[in-house]
Amino acid sequence: SRALSFKLVAECSTSKARACLITLPKCSVESPVFMPVGTKGTMKGLTSKQLEDIGFQIILGNTYHLGTNPGPELMEKANGLHDFMNWKRSILTDSGGYQMVSLLDLAEITEEGVKFASPYSDDMLLLTPERSIEIQNSIGADIIMQLDDVVASTTEGPRVEEAMHRTIRWLDRCITAHKNMHCQNLFCIVQGGLDMDLRRKCVEEIVKRDTPGIAIGGLSGGEDKQVFWKVVDLCTSLLPKNKPRYLMGVGYAVDLVVCSALGVDMYDCVYPTRTARFGTALVPWGQLRLKQSQYSMDFDPIDKNCPCLTCKTYTRAYLNSIIKQETVACHLLSIHNLTYQKQLMESIRKNIIQNTFPQFVKDFMKEMFPDGNYPQWAVDALASVNIQL
Amino acid sequence: MNFKVRVIDLAGSCCRLGALQFGTKVVETPGCLIYNRSGVVPHLTPDILETLDNVPPIMHTPLASIIEEPGLIKLRGYGKGLASFIGYKDNSVYISASDYQGEAMYQYNENKSISVWTKTGRTKVTPDDYSKFVEVCRPSWYQSLCDTVPANASIKRTRKSVDRTLEFLDQCLKYREKHDSLKTSELWAAVEGGGLVDERQRSAKESATRPVFGFTLEGFGSDQMNVETIFELLPLTTQNLPVEKPRLIHAIGSPTINSLSRSSKLTEVEEENGNDSSNDQDRTATFSLLNLREDRYNEDFSPLVSGCKCFVCSNHTRAYIHHLIINNEMLGGVLLMTHNLFQYIEFFRCIRTSLKNNKWKELRKLFDA
Ligand SMILES: [Zn+2]
Ligand SMILES: [Zn+2]
């Protein structure tokens, strides 16, 4: 039996965009969906209640962080991450591999797994596919990810092919190790770098494993956007229609709109909360850097159409005056930025369902780039799915 | 705006039970004001503050936290007053000139001005500068400008502090007299005197002759002021203040006073001296302290305080808060502050209820146990 049921609610008659209902053990998720990242069982100063109030149905937890601290034993005693942080809706955990490779200098990848130096002691530790699944089983997220062999998206040559094949071998080990099939969904990950042939081969192999959902990995690492969209487009065209597609690490507004047009269902990114910490507010016409003195006498809210607590309560001038001294400023901006992401995804979904998505995309792009100076990759990507800017 | 007070005689000590009314709002006393910096209660977004019941409808903002940012120009440009600017639209603010956040840098104060310390350094403020600033803030209450000295200041310096503070008070009153826009802002006189009984009494007696709304008792949050001195000085000071006016003490719950004894001592302060308002915020629980950093909370899935009705205790465990604190996660501060404020507000509510019901002795036993 599966812990996930998938329903295709609507498809755009022009592009590849789709609206789905993904029913998970803890909560149904309406897609396209953005999942905010709560690294250590907390979303940068926001309570789980506040995330619920914004309307999120699923959030992301990091296995690397939760697995080292507080650790899987405590997670088990706490009856999983849901109870530990008192989040009643759905959670997705990553495999922990990417965090190690990106955060730790000493990470080394072998066939066995990812070898790394413990940040808390002198020990060398090994994250195997089996160990990653074991930890994720103790965290208890609704969706868990296979350990994959991540290489920088700008890497070329035989290492990319090796990583792709190893990712498939590791997937098989993850499937064998997974204990909670009835309540946790293991997603596989498409790798293969920027090489279309490798991506094709990878999709072919992993689709055979019939996992409840499929992620597109190895992108969003500073690669050329023209190649980025082509890889996404290829994957969504090859992947089965009846399963959720999760594009890892993507969260800029334009990327979300374009990739939704290409048929992606799920996204995650630290960007909205990270940029909030630096004093930046996301708005439909770009962003406001509220530290700048131009906002010191600006008595409008960040976005007068935004329904969030911050916009209903405060002016830009007020935020400008507290931004350098009070952590509350960053909570307020996180609330706004996450509300912005949530609203954007809701609009995408609503327009797909009403079959007005192409017009929505045009309006969105027009507001974001009022001078019509659209990024070429977005123009090309959208044209490939019949949306002409 | 008015203040109704009832003095309750409890075996020789005079407790005061009162209600400060302004508009449709009431602050019951003894009570605490909640402190904010630049308009924010540290760590708390307004939705979280809203989870607390009985939050006094007036927010305390010290001058030092707003004089630079937002500052006069921004507030004047905004034009609707500080309460509205800081998103506290339905309620009001109290502006204090004294900054009890750290030891007063009193040696920098001068005959014509005091020095206010901000992030970028020192700003000299005269009574007129201050009054002008208060005018654009439109608070419900404000305190007169004061030259606060610690308990160990010399006799000469302490005398000067009392003289200057009275002079500043008179200038604040004169400005208020001339400016109608300040008529709806009530002025509280600062009572000084450091550690000297004579000076405390002189300051109280002189201030009491001025047309002020209430009195603030300054210098009791100083590092040099130990608990014994506080209890000696307070009754000798307050006996010189008119019964029918409210009294506010800043920073009485300073972290320098041992917190466990503090809670019971605080009740003594209330009982013996009948101060009407106290003001404090602290990262730790009020009555007995939990250090959430300690390893023993690692697997403790109980609430901070069992039976506590606050948002935090209803939703989160010690283990989770411990995890947040040891990882320096911002949410740790949010949750602790929320619980502590709830406890603090509840503490004062218990005091008032026990006074109303004549159960004071029982309540004290509970805290002393
Ligand atoms: Zn907003
Ligand atoms: Zn509590």
Curated annotation (Swiss-Prot), chain B:
Source domain of life: Eukaryota
Cross-referenced Pfam families: TGT
Keywords linked to the UniProt accession: Cytoplasm, Metal-binding, tRNA processing, Zinc
4Fe-4S among keywords: no
Residues covered by region (Disordered): 263-282
GO biological process: tRNA-guanine transglycosylation
Keyword Acetylation (UniProt): no
Residues where Zn(2+) binds: C308, C310, C313, H339
Compartment(s): Cytoplasm
Similarity comment: family membership: Belongs to the queuine tRNA-ribosyltransferase family. QTRT2 subfamily.
Protein name: Queuine tRNA-ribosyltransferase accessory subunit 2
Native organism: Trichoplax adhaerens (Trichoplax reptans)
Lineage start: Eukaryota, Metazoa, Placozoa, Uniplacotomia, Trichoplacea
